[in-house]
Amino acid sequence: MTAEALPGLTLMTAVACLACGGASRPGPTGPPAIPPGSCLVVGFLGGNDRWDDPFKGVRRLALELRREPGLYVETFENRRVRRALGFVEAALDADRNGEVDREETGRASIVVYGQSLGGWATLVFARLLAGRDLPVQLTLQIDSVGWDDADVPPNVRWAANLYQDEGAVIAGEHPIKPSDPRRTTVVGEWEFDYDRPPGNEIAIDGLPWHKTFLRADHARMDRDPRVWSKAARLVRDACEGRVPGASAAR
């Protein structure tokens, strides 16, 4: 299986993608080389969601983080990990010779996050970066769905996981574990509840049936402000070199 191809789908993943709809739009344009000391943040959306869908949590978080100096943030569809790799390499390639050398590798910290199938793509992407000897400061999985989305590769410094475990069919991957505990620290796994307030009060009106059928908890998590507030803190901490979660009570 190539990194671009979806793996054999489990029932859980199949329901996640069932009748997803929505045509893919052209992806982001290539970035300029970013300044040294920057934080490059890559987000992956779930299902068949468009890379630029402003109503999805992954994209909303990216647009919020873009307002902060020193953070360079872009989002991609979960099927476009190779496109995201090209984006990162272009951002690091200061001399524009088409290669990322050892000095350029250290120009920026890299943070990767994703929701649903985007959580699966987060680890697929981290493994691609490992193949290029590119370190990852943080991987953040949000209600991750997919195959082989629990093993965090050893080029990742910190890993975090936000999930719900009450969905009728879809429950986020947990626990995650480092391939090499000497190199990767799982800073935390946080479970969110949707069988009582405030979780079960989150409105999912207006979503198509395939986004809510047997997966209401999964849909609510994407709209849960607690989730994205936590995600924002974790990303900011990692970009600033702090242990993610250290800036606020867990």
Region spans (language model):
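Serine-dependent carboxylesterase/thioesterase catalytic core
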Residues: 89-179
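Solvent-exposed, acidic/flexible segments
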Residues: 37, 50-58, 77, 81, ...
